[in-house]
């Protein structure tokens, strides 16, 4: 612990936060520490962790942001979880954390289609949205100064979801639509199954289910 540090900011010096994993590393040797382990450490840090997105965040990059306690970006930015286009699903908690911050329809659409989404459509995901990227630093400092008490550390994993009748209807509609559109491509249906776990399982069991389904796609 360093008492001189009051908060941690995760950002990028480039005009992109992160494009996600380098899939060429999957066939390599030791990959430790694995991203889910890193994100668990981030999420359970006792000091506020803020993801500041100066540009797009995709795949594992967005999963990093979702594991942080707060997220700041700018209005024209886009984020996404495109893993389905590789025949897999988000494997570092994306199927569990995104539904806890966005509504079921939004989370399912993002994960099942893999399409980029405007941050303006994700008010529950981002705590502060600057009007321009050049205002990010100033706005982040102001946001940091506003953090205090129990709101300083907001762990996404602590949010509890339940499968309401309305949410069940969303799952049924998305599943029916996906079965028609996927034409035997099974990754989108695995994505739905993983997201369902966010509503029917504990966070820990949901992560295990996500990992199992991820391996079934490999």
Show where each model-derived region lies.
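Glycine- (often His-adjacent) and acidic-residue-rich active-site loop
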Residues: 4, 11-41, 57, 85-88
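Amphipathic alpha-helical segments at domain termini/boundaries
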Residues: 15, 19, 63-67, 107-213
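Glycine-rich beta-to-alpha active-site loop
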Residues: 42-86, 90
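Hydrophobic, secondary-structure "cap" segments at the distal end of domains
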Residues: 95-105
């Amino acid at each position: 612990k360093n008492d001189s540090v009051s908060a941690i900011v995760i950002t990028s010096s480039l005009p992109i936060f992160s494009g996600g994993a380098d899939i060429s590393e999957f066939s390599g040797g030791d990959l430790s520490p694995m991203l889910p382990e890193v994100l668990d450490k981030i999420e359970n840090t006792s000091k506020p962790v803020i993801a500041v997105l100066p540009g797009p965040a995709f795949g594992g990059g967005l999963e990093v942001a979702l594991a942080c306690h707060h997220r700041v970006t700018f209005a024209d930015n886009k984020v996404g979880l495109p893993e389905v286009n590789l025949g897999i699903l988000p494997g570092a908690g994306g199927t569990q954390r995104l539904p806890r911050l966005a509504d079921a329809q939004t989370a399912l659409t993002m994960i099942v289609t893999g399409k980029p989404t405007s941050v303006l459509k994700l008010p529950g995901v981002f705590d502060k949205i600057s009007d321009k990227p050049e205002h990010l630093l100033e706005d982040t400092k102001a946001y940091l100064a506003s953090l205090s008490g129990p709101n300083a550390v907001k762990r996404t994993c602590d949010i509890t979801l339940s499968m309401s009748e309305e949410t069940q209807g969303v799952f049924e509609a998305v599943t029916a639509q996906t079965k028609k559109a996927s034409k035997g491509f099974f990754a989108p249906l695995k994505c739905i199954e993983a997201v369902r776990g966010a509503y029917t399982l504990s966070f820990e069991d949901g992560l295990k289910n996500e990992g199992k389904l991820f391996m079934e796609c490999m």
